[in-house]
Amino acid sequence: MALLHKEKLIECIDNELQNSGTLLLLTKNIVVSEISYNGNDYKYFTFNENHDLIGQENLKGATSNNIAKMVYNWIAKNPQTNKVWVGEPRIRIYFKNNLYHTNNNHVCIKDFYKVSISVSPNIFNDRSIWCTKCTSFYPFSSILSPNLFQ
């Protein structure tokens, strides 16, 4: 069962990247990494806490699926008890376009939360997803009811 949920979560990230989405990883509300599609390849950017660019890399030959698996594995291997970069290990995942919104029902948020807690109940305790339609962060831990956004 967990494998199906893991695959669903990877598919969610993969679909976003395939549709020219941008994936941002944030720590304490600060963007520290970005993965974007730039025509032929994906680019990986890293930033410091002032949002100064400190590194960039062309991910030549990478597919949206490889990247999705890498992101999933990175999240899974950094539980909340570990330090991620510097400071409080709060990870947010940002989907730039509206791919997962259906009738303003926040499908992206509900699916991502449901899948995440099915993989590991405590993995996303302090993690959240950016909703582009209502432009705010929703903590996974407060999305307890499937009816919350209906």
From Swiss-Prot:
Q: Which UniProt keywords apply?
A: Early protein, Metal-binding
Names of the cofactor(s):
Zn(2+)
Q: Name one GO molecular function term.
A: metal ion binding
Outline the inducing conditions: Expressed in the early phase of the viral replicative cycle.
Q: Where does the record place a coiled coil?
A: none
The note on the cofactor says:
Binds 1 Zn(2+) ion.
**General function of this protein:** May participate in a redox cascade for the formation of disulfide bonds in viral proteins.
User: Which family is this sequence assigned to?
Assistant: Belongs to the asfivirus A151R family.
Quote the subunit structure annotation. Answer: Monomer. Homodimer. Interacts with protein B119L. Interacts with membrane protein E248R.
Protein name in UniProt? Protein A151R
> What's the source species for this entry?
African swine fever virus (isolate Pig/Kenya/KEN-50/1950)
